[in-house]
Amino acid sequence: MQNEEKYNFIKYYEHSFRNNWASEAVTDYGTNVTLTYGDLATKIAKLHILFEQCGIKKDDKIAVMGKNNSNWVSVYLATVTYGAIVVPILQDFKANDAIHIVNHSESKLLFISDINWEGIELDQIPDILAVFSLNDWHPISLTLDPERISMSAIVDVFNSRYPNGYTAEEVHYAERSNDQIASINYTSGTTGFSKGVIMPLNGLAGNIR
């Protein structure tokens, strides 16, 4: 690893995926579902294509709400390594709080568990281009061309882009310095709606040095 990359948060993950491709990365609690670093990197690559198809750009916000599992991890890491800003929403928040956070953060995409979507309507979150299920990735609601962002369309683009398969050598993520924003975290406030706290990449990098 080059000196300038030594403490870069995104480079941490880029190098970790490359160097630990066959090792176990995450397991869904209470199941036998375990993803290797290679499996996780592949899911991230497909999510990056989905972001592209949705027109997501650097510093756009992507919200994620649901219990911690491998899909939640995939969205979080895919967002940060794409160069976008992740907005994690506590799964215990009520629908009104989630709506406020999505709107206040100006998120463009929302990944949410099916149970957390109950009580939310697309017209309540007007800046959102598409909502995807964290359970199985199906589009719950969208304003975009469904043929461009269906899972089958994403797989077709993925297979065309990586005709020989996705390998460790293919892992290349966004170039972002640690002083740029990684996430906006909304805490459960004691009065009124929750407030957002900006977390730079350096704040996350400091936890894994």
PLM-predicted stretches and their roles:
Residues 36-38, 173-175, 182-206:
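Conserved AMP-binding A3 loop
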Residues 22, 149-186, 193:
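Conserved pre-ATP/AMP-binding loop-to-beta segment of ANL
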Residues 45-49, 103-106, 115, 192, ...:
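Solvent-exposed alpha-helix faces
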Residues 60, 84, 179-180:
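Surface-exposed loop/turn positions
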Residues 25-55, 60-69, 73, 77, ...:
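Conserved AMP-binding/adenylate-forming core of the ANL superfamily
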Residues 2-26, 42:
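A short N-terminal helical cap/helix-turn-helix that marks the beginning
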Residues 54, 81, 85-158:
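Structural core segment of the AMP-binding/adenylate-forming
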